[in-house]
């Protein structure tokens, strides 16, 4: 790991650059058999520049690039070889301008670009001796890619009109470019001096999906009395894709009431809409998970979440809490039974179903905040399930 930081212009401009790379692949390489090679590594690079125009105006520039790589190759002899490799990573570039209008109002204006891509490649190669010292080679390879590009503009305001109000509001715009899935296969037959076949097949639609997302929000953290606080908010969003527009109003409300000096109660309700779905092809998180947008056929996911909690601070140096929640979801997206993103020329929209979901849970926590030893201990019990139309996934029965 490397970290460099320092001033560019004294009391005005500074920089910070850090980079790291794992080295397990370099350590393991000498111990691998000659006919099998495995490699895994990751790296990330962060760079920041901060500039102070004045006491009221500051600019923050940042860039990030990270990548994970996995490869496996098998070479039993000179006649047969096969292997695969997987790469996934993110690139983020952003500029944030912070401006203080007065002691009650300040703003943050952010412009950013984000690129996510994963790529899986597999190949097999066979060689045959034809005589006269000539070799015939047959090679097959397949490549699967998925990615997202986002261009984002956001402006946020923080306003304190009085001691009992803390208001936040803002608006934003995102231009999305999705490539949900692109699969390419290539077959070649050749000798040392002649090519008999060199063909590329595009098994899936290579088209991109473009979308525009506009949002605006406002919230007020309101002090009703010395014991009661309310947070009231409303979020508006509009998503336009494939000549189809979706919009949503999403209220949020939370209340915090201090029952006694030691006991505080909290309750909240949140409605949310999500225009980008995560399609998981495996029961654990993998880079093969696809981020796909809503379309004319795929509707936005909507959820309503309710929570209730209590907090106790009656023992010096300790905090105890219990919190429960319930979340109801609509238009949840899952792959149909027996379907994944591999091995089919069918587009992703034809391989998924929309259904319902729910999630419920409770969390207990004890936290020590004073003394030479501090820390926390928590326990969470939760359950989540899905339900699809009869005859669909799991024959319409609920499943985790």
Q: Predicted segments — roles?
A:
Residues 1-23, 34-69, 85-109, 113, ...:
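Transmembrane beta-barrel wall of Gram-negative outer-membrane proteins
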Residues 12-15, 56-59, 101-107, 117, ...:
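Repeated loop/turn-to-beta-strand initiation elements of outer-membrane beta-barrel proteins
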Residues 17-23, 61-67, 109-115, 169-175, ...:
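Transmembrane beta-barrel strands of outer-membrane/channel proteins
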Residues 31-36, 77-84, 92-96, 136-144, ...:
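Extracellular loop and loop/strand-boundary signature of outer-membrane beta-barrel proteins
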Residues 69-71, 117, 184, 257, ...:
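Surface-exposed extracellular loop regions of Gram-negative outer-membrane beta-barrel proteins
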Residues 166-264, 275-276, 391-394:
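Signature of Gram-negative outer-membrane beta-barrel scaffolds
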Residues 326-328, 346-400:
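Gram-negative outer-membrane beta-barrel transporters
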């Amino acid at each position: 790991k490397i970290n460099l930081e320092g001033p560019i212009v004294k009391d005005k401009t500074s920089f910070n650059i850090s980079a790291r790379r794992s080295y397990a692949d370099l350590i393991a390489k000498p111990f691998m058999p000659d006919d099998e090679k495995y490699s895994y590594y990751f790296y990330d690079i962060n760079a920041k520049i901060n500039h102070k125009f004045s006491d009221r105006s500051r600019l923050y520039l940042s860039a990030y690039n990270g990548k994970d790589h996995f490869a496996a190759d098998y070479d039993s002899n000179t006649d047969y070889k096969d292997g695969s490799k997987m790469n996934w990573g993110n690139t983020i570039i952003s500029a944030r301008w912070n401006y203080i209008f007065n002691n009650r109002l300040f703003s943050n204006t952010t412009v950013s670009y984000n690129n996510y891509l994963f790529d899986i490649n597999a190949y097999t190669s066979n060689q045959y001796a034809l005589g006269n010292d000539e070799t015939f080679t047959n090679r097959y390879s397949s490549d699967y890619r998925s990615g997202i590009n986002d261009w984002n503009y956001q402006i946020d305001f923080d306003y304190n009109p009085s001691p009992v109000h803390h208001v936040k509001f803002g608006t934003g715009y995102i231009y999305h470019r999705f490539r949900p899935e692109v699969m390419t296969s290539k077959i070649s037959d050749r000798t040392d001096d002649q090519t008999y076949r060199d063909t590329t097949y595009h098994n899936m639609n290579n088209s991109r999906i473009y979308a525009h997302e506009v949002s605006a929000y406002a919230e007020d953290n309101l002090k009703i009395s010395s014991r009661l606080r309310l947070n009231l908010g409303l979020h508006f969003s509009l998503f336009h894709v494939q000549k189809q527009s979706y919009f949503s109003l999403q209220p949020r409300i939370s209340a915090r009431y201090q029952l006694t000096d030691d006991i505080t109660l909290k309750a909240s309700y949140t409605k949310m809409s999500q225009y980008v779905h995560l399609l998981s092809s495996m029961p654990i998180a993998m880079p093969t998970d696809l981020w796909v947008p809503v379309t004319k056929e795929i509707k936005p996911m909507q959820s309503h979440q309710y929570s209730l909690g209590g907090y106790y601070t009656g023992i010096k140096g300790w905090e105890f809490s219990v919190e429960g929640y319930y979340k109801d979801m609509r238009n949840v997206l899952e792959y149909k039974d027996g379907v994944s993103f591999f091995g089919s020329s069918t587009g992703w929209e034809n391989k998924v179903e929309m259904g319902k979901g729910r999630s419920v849970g409770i969390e207990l926590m004890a936290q020590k905040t004073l003394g030479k030893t501090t820390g926390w201990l928590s326990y969470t019990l939760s359950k989540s399930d899905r339900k699809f139309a009869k005859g669909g996934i799991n024959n319409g029965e609920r499943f985790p």
